[in-house]
A protein has these predicted regions:
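C-terminal catalytic/motor cores of large multi-domain enzyme assemblies
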Residues: 1-212
Length: 212
């Protein structure tokens, strides 16, 4: 499938702005549905299966100095329009500082010394990754879902593999790179300019080892 023309066509048909990120979320939900190994989690060294394809997107909510995450639950049950509406609503709340869970976490981080922040983040992330919710701290179950999607298109990087953040405990991270143009020879032997965009995967091999 030619992603860019496809998104343009779908946007015109449904009068909705579908981005590569939206396409990637839906694509990953389809892939994970076929390969259950990538949407489980590891609890105390033991692989546990998990219901539903939850996919996390990283969001820049400040002036480049604050990164938040928002997770779309059960993506396999939603169409692209539903995913778009939910993602846009979540991003709006984050950028307007109206997301209660994010505000609780940021308030806590402002109160603790810097040298404690790293270990505390790792502990909280692990608690979330094994399905424990702490409402008073704004900590949700499976905060980063089973896949993290990040877009580096705004940085002008055409090809890159992003490492999985240790705090995410996610099996997969998908990187959306910058669009670029190349001259290619078509089926008629003519030279034409086409737009390309690379989508690169980084995986945690342990999830696959547990299922082989």
């Amino acid at each position: 499938i030619k992603i860019i023309p496809y998104l343009k066509k779908k946007s015109e048909e449904l009068k909705e702005h579908f981005t590569p990120t939206i396409y990637a979320i839906k694509l990953m939900s389809i892939i994970m549905k076929k390969y259950p190994a990538v949407y489980g989690y590891i609890k105390f060294g033991i692989y546990e299966p998990k219901d539903g394809m939850d996919i996390c997107c990283l969001v820049n909510v400040g002036q480049g100095n604050e990164l938040a995450n928002t997770t779309i639950k059960n993506c396999e049950q939603k169409n692209m329009k539903e995913i778009t509406d939910e993602l846009m609503d979540n991003v709006k709340l984050l950028r307007e500082r109206k997301n209660k869970d994010q505000n609780k976490k940021m308030k806590l981080y402002r109160l603790i010394p810097t040298f404690i922040m790293g270990p505390m983040t790792q502990i909280f992330s692990y608690i979330s990754s094994i399905g424990i919710k702490v409402k008073s701290l704004g900590l949700k179950q499976f905060e980063f879902g089973s896949c993290v999607i990040t877009s580096i298109g705004g940085l002008g990087i055409e090809n890159s593999f992003v490492p999985i953040p240790p705090v995410s405990f996610a099996p997969v991270i998908l990187t959306l790179c910058s669009k670029y143009e190349r001259n290619i020879r078509n089926e008629k032997g003519e030279i034409e300019t086409k737009t390309f965009m690379k989508m690169n995967f980084t995986t945690d091999y342990r999830f696959f080892d547990y299922n082989t």
